[in-house]
Amino acid sequence: MFFDLFSSKNKKIVKRWMKEHEEIVTLAHKIIAAYSSNNHILAKKELISLNNTAVNHLMNEDIELYKLLKKRNDMHHKIESDIKKFKENFSETKINLMKFLTYYSKAETPLDESFFDQFNSLVGILGERIDFEENNLYQKLEAI
């Protein structure tokens, strides 16, 4: 805790984002467990929580990465191309995730087999994406 007082802003941001990743993964597992046990009410509740958590995480990530791109010093220049690649590569996945969560978070939208198949596919893609972020982009952010 004392060490956190002296951590760089980027390290604090990365730490927060990694905690949010844990929350997202935990919520995804809760949704799968609830749906698998035929508790669609709980699955919907957890899906709404996931929607809120994911939207907040993505918006904050976009804002902070945008701020980094606006800085024009040597340290930030080193990661500029990595940030641009990250944003370009994740753009389609992010749009699909937001559409999916928005659609299935609606009270009137039932959680059916199509939902479960798509959700499992998205969870796999997001798992890979989170792993990539944490092991590439986030490590570089912490270093500057």
Language model regions located:
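Small-residue-biased structural context
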Residues: 1-144
